[in-house]
């Protein structure tokens, strides 16, 4: 028989830098998970993606065991990295902070494809372009 799920915890943690301090510790401590075991496993799985924020979905079972799924980094984080900027524009309709090429947008869309509910790469690109627009990033061909 399948184990009974008691909690699903969603967090965004920097790759390779999970530690028992907040926000990881309290979120998993409440569910009774072995926090150090999670941190070691997460850091090992995400060591190759240093510098990115990785969304993770932790499923906690009745016997306090857990499994977790790492997702692709948020589009905004990937766009900031591609554009080489620290943060998006506070007023994206007035102040443009950076410009990126359409082929960079395609790369990001291809990377994000498993987590987006888009049927084609073009639809995924439009989603990423919308995120870029709302951050004050201009896309050129």
Swiss-Prot record:
- A matching Pfam family: Ribosomal_L11
Q: How is it modified after translation?
A: One or more lysine residues are methylated.
Name the keywords, alphabetized.
Methylation, Ribonucleoprotein, Ribosomal protein, RNA-binding, rRNA-binding
What GO terms are given for molecular function? large ribosomal subunit rRNA binding; structural constituent of ribosome
Q: Where are the transmembrane segments?
A: none
GO:BP terms for this protein? translation
Taxonomic superkingdom = Bacteria
Keyword check for S-adenosyl-L-methionine, yes or no. Answer: no
Q: What cellular component GO annotations does this protein have? A: cytosolic large ribosomal subunit
Family indicated by similarity: Belongs to the universal ribosomal protein uL11 family.
Q: Which HAMAP family match?
A: Ribosomal_uL11 (MF_00736)
**Which purpose does this protein serve, as stated in its record?**
Forms part of the ribosomal stalk which helps the ribosome interact with GTP-bound translation factors.
Q: How does it assemble?
A: Part of the ribosomal stalk of the 50S ribosomal subunit. Interacts with L10 and the large rRNA to form the base of the stalk. L10 forms an elongated spine to which L12 dimers bind in a sequential fashion forming a multimeric L10(L12)X complex.
| Entry protein name | Large ribosomal subunit protein uL11
């Amino acid at each position: 028989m399948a184990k009974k799920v008691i909690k699903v915890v969603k967090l965004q943690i920097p790759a390779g830098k999970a530690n028992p301090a907040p926000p990881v510790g309290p979120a998993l401590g409440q569910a009774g998970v072995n926090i150090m075991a999670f941190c070691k496993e997460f850091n090992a799985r995400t060591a190759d993606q240093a510098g990115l924020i990785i969304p993770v979905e932790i499923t906690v079972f009745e016997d306090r065991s857990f499994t977790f799924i790492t997702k692709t980094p948020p589009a905004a984080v990937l766009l900031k990295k591609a554009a080489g900027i620290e943060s998006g524009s506070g007023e994206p309709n007035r102040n443009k902070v950076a410009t990126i090429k359409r082929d960079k947008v395609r790369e990001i869309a291809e990377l994000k494809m498993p987590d987006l509910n888009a049927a084609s790469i073009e639809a995924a690109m439009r989603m990423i372009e919308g995120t870029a627009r709302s951050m004050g990033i201009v896309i050129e061909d």
